[in-house]
């Protein structure tokens, strides 16, 4: 990778303690190439500028791993869209088992395509609604980490995410600059579903406005009636 923006990726990930090989940088390059090509057909992202993609997609995703001493046992990503943040994390941590949940067919098709192009292994794409996945006993309470970017407000998101987490697992939820009101509104849902906010951290990406990362830890089993039927969590939040 060459150029000022690519150097920003190299320098920033190094500063975050995420060492990447030339092969991994090449995978990021190919990922963006494919995203730009497919975006003309399917409108996968509103961000068209390559340098902005590196900042707002790649670095924004990799920020989640800046404190990882080792990769988690596994990760599931809700509403994966074009693959952020899960696929950048998979590229950075090749042995990390990753599951992507995407309900839109064209986006699931892109995810499968880019996984094949990058020759990534131990990655699954579930073309399903998240409510369905959360009620599947093969998926329920199986994951150490759930990620979800721009999916739903926090009180809705926790109903999607917490059923998938094992006790002690974490939901990593990137949010806006000040998520105080969202966190307050989610307290009842957290109590019912067995989670608690363990951290709310400022996120600083070079060249971008400050944002935050809300980390929720699962501290108790989620009642079996959650998540509720498709569409209900969003229409009638807890």
UniProtKB/Swiss-Prot annotation:
Q: Which Gene Ontology molecular function entries are recorded, alphabetically?
A: rRNA (guanine-N7-)-methyltransferase activity
Predominant subcellular localization, coarse grouping: cytoplasm
Which top class of enzyme applies to this chain?
transferase
Which InterPro entries does the record associate with it?
A: rRNA_ssu_MeTfrase_G, SAM-dependent_MTases_sf
Gene3D superfamilies on file = Vaccinia Virus protein VP39
Residues annotated for S-adenosyl-L-methionine binding in this entry = 79, 84, 102-104, 130-131, 149
Give its localization: Cytoplasm
Key words of the record: Cytoplasm, Methyltransferase, rRNA processing, S-adenosyl-L-methionine, Transferase
Q: Give any Gene Ontology cellular component.
A: cytosol
EC number of this enzyme: 2.1.1.-
Q: What does this protein do?
A: Specifically methylates the N7 position of a guanine in 16S rRNA.
| Family that this chain belongs to | Belongs to the methyltransferase superfamily. RNA methyltransferase RsmG family.
NCBIfam families according to UniProt = rsmG_gidB
Q: What is this protein called?
A: Ribosomal RNA small subunit methyltransferase G
Q: Which gene encodes it?
A: rsmG
